[in-house]
């Protein structure tokens, strides 16, 4: 062998070494150990247990036939993954674009690329693992990367990159359009591990997935996952036909012990969602762009101990979103939900900042009295939401939806929801049904730009400790009576009155005056009378008539109590009726009523508890001026002057149609 040939061989060998040393060195898990951030009282999330990575257990997909010019590299990549020994190793995806995912190239029935235990899948900088186009890839819940592996646990797996130029691309645009066109398919998650433990996903980008991006566990069978510095990017579900992505959940969790931090997620469904058996889930220091927010459900059975902290949202459809669904057979998807904390949230351009829906999706009745009358029997699937804390949450602008929307179930109320230092500004107010102990504290404030703060309060209790829901109206007369009619109505659109009261309704209807009367028109709808702070109503007079002549009308609900058609009826002959409603205990904050009619015209007179100990007051029929009467209607002094009242015994007297008290 001559000297020139030896030099050529040595140079070739040296050229191969730096690539491995720089791009293929496994960084270990020291950074993750230092970033654990385990909440007090929780067990730490376990990290993968892996061997030392050397050239002997590192496998480059190019060595198994993969090529950037190939139409599909599924078999070549799988051969590299299969080459990893039972003791563990690393598979390297070099820089370049690598097409994979054709159904006819799969070697497994459940995964396109199947990863076994103690494997590191490493995407180099500039590497793109790209799914084949729609029509060539499997579309029936097949996992694209990971382990479905029924009956087989997969442990100690790492999928990692070298930053945002390490990309997994699902080419989802054609899939999303197919869904809009009514084509039937059900794509699996891009990355999914159903069974096993100790998973680590870090430092790469997923974009344009056909469906869910990352799924951890199935029925609690997988646990202990750490996901950090992962970017997820799909269009919003509201981007419009041909542009929107659909059902592209960011990270979906179905098992215990998961840490997620330093992630940037924008998509077309839940940014991060906890479903059945998600427990001890800690999400922190994340940015959520488009998507449906920090979500729970709609499968919520056995979800416990979830903490989202330091979340910055911009353009998210929902902020904090909790929901329990109803199956097609009518059974529920809940049971055992408890202990959530959402802290240090900043929301910008977020439509619905805080919602819980136990009738997901919108299976509740517009009149909650109907839902209450149809309460179902409790069973193991009934949702039991309890102990929910929002702390240091604020919106930076006006949200387009409801400030707060909480709908429990009549047979199982949402319990113990605390808003601690929460400031929300929204176009629409608060709607709560079947909620026990909603607490506002520590500088919390709800501001509404359109209508009243309280839209609906049905079969619910709350405690506003800091004036969070105060309307800001001040009234000097807290005793009343207070009349709500056209004479005291100051704003038809807002439904506000000169005496500090207001009336709101779900449909945003304005308040018009009945022709030739002082009555206000009310259509079939539930209305909420907003009572000023410090006022407690003990009695209400209702005066008015039907505004149509084709059928009788009536008020079917007052303050959460349902009434039949004969109790507070307004006949079709349009005769004026007067009714008095007395409340068993003083009503404060809000009072609801629901007309059942095309349209009634009504006025309300509200009374507070001003009891003097006098059981009955006799109406005085006499009209003679300058006489003084006692409360029995007897003349105690004729042709009197005002100064004559001073000579009377202690008591209450009527003089010239005014009441006087002599002490």
Regions from the PLM with identified roles:
Residues 125-126, 155-166, 197-208, 221-238, ...:
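Right-handed parallel beta-helix
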Residues 470-523:
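N-terminal targeting leaders for non-cytosolic proteins
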Residues 513-534, 576-580, 599-601:
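Short beta-strands within extracellular/lumenal beta-sheet-rich domains
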Residues 319-470:
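Extracellular beta-rich repeat passengers
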Residues 2-117, 127-202, 218, 223, ...:
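Extracellular "leader-to-stem" segments immediately downstream of a signal peptide or signal-anchor
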Residues 611-663:
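C-terminal outer-membrane/trafficking sorting elements
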Residues 546-562:
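Short, surface-exposed beta-strand/strand-loop-strand elements in extracellular ectodomains
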Residues 102-103, 131-134, 171-174, 179, ...:
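Short glycine/acidic-rich loop motifs that flank beta-strands on beta-rich extracellular proteins
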């Amino acid at each position: 062998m001559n000297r020139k040939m030896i030099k050529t061989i040595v140079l070739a060998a040296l050229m191969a070494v730096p690539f491995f040393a720089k791009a293929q060195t496994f960084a270990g898990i020291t950074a993750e150990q230092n970033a654990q951030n385990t909440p007090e009282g929780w067990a730490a999330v376990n990290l993968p247990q892996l061997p030392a990575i050397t050239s002997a257990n590192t496998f480059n997909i190019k060595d198994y036939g993969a090529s950037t010019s190939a139409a599909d590299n599924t078999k070549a990549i799988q051969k590299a993954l299969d080459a990893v020994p039972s003791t563990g190793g690393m598979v390297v995806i070099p820089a370049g674009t690598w097409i994979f995912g054709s159904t006819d190239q799969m070697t497994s029935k459940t995964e396109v690329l199947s990863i076994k235990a103690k494997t590191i899948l490493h995407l180099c900088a500039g590497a793109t693992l790209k799914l084949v186009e729609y029509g060539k890839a499997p579309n029936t819940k097949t996992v694209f990367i990971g382990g479905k592996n029924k009956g087989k646990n997969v442990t100690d797996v790492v999928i990692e990159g070298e930053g945002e130029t390490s990309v997994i691309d699902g080419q989802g645009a054609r899939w999303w359009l197919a869904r809009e066109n009514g084509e039937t398919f059900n794509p699996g998650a891009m990355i999914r591990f159903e069974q096993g433990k100790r998973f680590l996903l870090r430092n790469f980008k997923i974009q344009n997935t056909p469906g869910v991006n990352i799924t951890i566990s199935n029925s609690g069978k997988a646990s202990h996952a750490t996901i950090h510095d992962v970017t997820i990017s799909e269009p919003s579900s509201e981007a419009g036909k041909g542009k929107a992505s659909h059902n592209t959940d960011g990270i979906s969790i179905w098992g215990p012990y998961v840490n997620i931090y330093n992630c940037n997620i924008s998509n077309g469904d839940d940014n991060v969602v906890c479903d059945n058996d998600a427990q001890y889930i800690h999400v922190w220091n994340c940015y959520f762009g488009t998507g449906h927010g920090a979500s729970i459900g709609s499968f919520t059975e056995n979800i416990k101990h979830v903490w989202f902290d330091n979340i910055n949202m911009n353009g998210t459809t929902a902020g904090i979103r909790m929901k329990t669904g109803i199956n097609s057979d009518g059974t529920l998807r809940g049971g055992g939900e408890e202990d959530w904390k959402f802290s240090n949230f900043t929301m910008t351009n977020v439509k619905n900042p805080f919602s819980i829906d136990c009738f997901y999706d919108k299976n509740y009745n517009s009149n909650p009295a109907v839902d209450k009358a149809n309460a179902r029997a409790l069973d193991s699937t009934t949702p039991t939401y309890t102990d929910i804390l929002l702390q240091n949450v604020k919106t930076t602008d006006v949200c387009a939806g409801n400030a707060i929307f909480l709908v429990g179930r009549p047979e199982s109320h949402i319990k113990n929801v605390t808003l601690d230092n929460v400031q929300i500004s929204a176009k629409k107010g608060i709607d709560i049904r079947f909620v026990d102990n909603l607490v506002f504290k520590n500088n919390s404030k709800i501001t509404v730009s359109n209508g009243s703060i309280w839209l609906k309060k049905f079969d619910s209790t709350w405690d506003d400790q800091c004036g969070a829901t105060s309307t800001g109206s001040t009234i000097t007369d807290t005793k009343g009576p207070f009349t709500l009619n056209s004479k005291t109505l100051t704003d038809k659109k807002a439904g506000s009155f000169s005496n500090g009261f207001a009336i709101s309704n779900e449909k945003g209807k304005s308040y018009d005056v009945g022709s030739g009367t002082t009555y206000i028109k009310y259509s079939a709808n539930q209305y909420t009378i907003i009572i000023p702070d410090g006022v407690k109503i003990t009695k209400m007079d209702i005066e008015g008539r039907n505004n149509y002549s084709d059928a009788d009308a009536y008020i079917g609900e007052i303050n959460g109590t349902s009434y039949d058609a004969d109790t507070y009826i307004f006949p079709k002959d349009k005769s004026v009726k007067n009714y008095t409603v007395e409340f068993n205990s003083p009503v404060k904050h809000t009072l609801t009523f629901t007309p059942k009619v095309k349209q009634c015209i009504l006025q309300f007179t509200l009374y507070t508890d001003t009891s003097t100990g006098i059981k009955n007051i006799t109406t005085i029929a006499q009209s003679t001026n300058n006489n003084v009467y006692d409360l029995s209607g007897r003349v105690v002094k004729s042709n009197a002057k005002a100064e004559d009242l001073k000579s009377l015994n202690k008591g209450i007297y009527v003089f010239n149609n005014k009441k006087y008290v002599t002490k």
